[in-house]
Amino acid sequence: MNPPRVFISYSHDSASHKEWVLNFATTLRNRGIDAVLDQWDLKPGDDLPHFMETELSRSDFVIMVCTESYVEKANAGQGGVGYEKMIMTSSLLKKIDNSKVIPIIRQTSKADVPTFLGTKIYIDFSNDKDEEYNLDELLRTLLNAPLFEKPQIGSNPFTPMNQSNPDR
């Protein structure tokens, strides 16, 4: 079985944020995830919109790294983030139960996601001390390896009247 392919969508807020995203993507690759990141997969002369469209449709999952700037750009439809939002909104409308998109929070202020992701459960990576726990939750989702298996349904403890002892 091939490792899950994961496209990482983020805004280029600062050099330190880009470095965090690069380290995050490297960690995913080191733990069995085929992470796709512009910092590795794009070079001068490549077509950015084509890259985004291709990876958004080709990937098994899309991780959206939500910062204040990311949320602002997505909600306003600006830049690459706005373009990706347009593609993902269309995809989400086609399949309402789509769990392909996983928002992660990387903010210093109030945790927030773009409006179009408002119904999605997110993972909060804003506190570095909880990063291993949150990474474990994310990896379990991407690798379909839940922490707890849902138990099988047992048999009905009640028997129908016509099969029970009538003398009781």
What are these language model-derived features?
Residues M52-L56, V113-T115:
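Short glycine-biased active-site loop of nucleotidyltransferases that positions the nucleotide triphosphate
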Residues Y83-S99:
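Arginine/glycine-rich "motif VI" loop of SF2 helicases in the C-terminal RecA-like domain
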Residues N23-E53, E68-G77, V81:
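Conserved BB-loop
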Residues S59:
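An anion/phosphate-binding loop that grips the pyrophosphate of nucleotide cofactors and donors
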Residues T67-E68, S109:
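Flexible loop residues that form catalytic
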Residues M1-N30, N75, I96-R168:
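C-terminal interaction surface of TIR/SEFIR-family domains
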Residues V62-I63:
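Inter-motif core of Ras-like GTPase G domains
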Residues G79-E84, D130:
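Short acidic-hydrophobic sequence patches enriched in Asp/Glu that either
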